A protein has these predicted regions:
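Low-acidity, Ser/Thr- and Arg-rich intrinsically disordered low-complexity segments
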Residues: 1-13
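The feature marks proteins involved in alpha-glucan
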Residues: 11-40, 68, 77-81, 89-185, ...
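Structural beta-strand segments of beta-rich domains
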Residues: 42-46
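Conserved, mostly hydrophobic/aromatic
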Residues: 48, 97, 188
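Short proline/glycine-enriched turn/loop motifs at strand-loop junctions of beta-rich domains
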Residues: 49-55
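Beta-strand signatures of extracellular beta-sandwich domains
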Residues: 57-59
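Surface-exposed loop/edge segments in extracytoplasmic proteins
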Residues: 65-72
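Phosphate-binding active sites in nucleotide-utilizing proteins
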Residues: 190-202
Length: 202
């Protein structure tokens, strides 16, 4: 599983077939930037912008993406960014967001926590997108048209974000340890520099 053994002390998993838990796991304040979900080697910082939302839930899913196992409310709000830090959460974990706020179409507000949202800064997505009119925030065919609200949950069919580790694995390579006074930085256009190189295949 995409978490360390110590995670089980702070996070309660949901037994198969049981309801989603809204427990209070170990969540720190984190930072409002960078936006998105960022793994730092020890845990993840979660940051989502919204100027008008009232609260944001960070939702975790089992590896198949079909079952939601946890919802964690982001505890802080800074410069219109909801944020929190979750220690021990590791790359590979599937996630999404539920955003709570006013449903006032006349004012341009269509917050609907029944609709799982994809992280706009996600670096990797898991699962196919299966079209359904449940993705609309309003009820198709309703006499109130787009002023109505559709409360069908979309979590099962919506692709999920995947936490990734951005750190590059250098393997046996080491820094050249060359002094700056002995260094020349040369910016070049790849095609212009290599197009006529005799040892490169055409």
């Amino acid at each position: 599983p995409p978490w360390s053994s110590s995670r089980n002390e702070a996070w309660s998993r949901v037994p198969r077939g049981a309801a989603v838990t809204r427990s209070a796991p170990r969540v720190w304040s984190g930072t409002p930037y960078p936006l998105g979900v960022t793994f730092d080697g020890r845990g993840v910082n979660v940051a989502l912008f919204s100027a008008h939302a009232e609260r944001v839930e960070f939702c975790l899913f089992e590896p198949t993406g079909q079952r939601e196992i946890e919802r964690i409310e982001l505890p802080e709000y800074t410069d219109e960014v909801f944020h929190g830090y979750l220690p021990d959460l590791l790359p590979g974990q599937l996630y999404g967001f539920r955003v709570h706020g006013p449903y006032q179409p006349e004012a341009g507000h269509r917050f609907n926590p029944a609709k799982l949202l994809i992280d706009p800064y996600a670096k990797l997505l898991s699962g196919p997108f299966r079209w359904s009119n449940a993705y609309f925030g309003y009820r198709i065919g309703s006499p109130r048209e787009d002023l109505s609200i559709d409360r069908r949950d979309t979590a099962r069919s919506m692709p999920k974000g995947v936490i990734v580790d951005d750190a590059f694995q250098w393997g046996a390579e080491r820094r050249p340890a060359r002094a700056w006074e002995d260094t020349v930085v040369y910016e070049a256009h790849t095609r212009g520099l290599t197009e006529r190189h005799p040892e490169l295949p055409h």
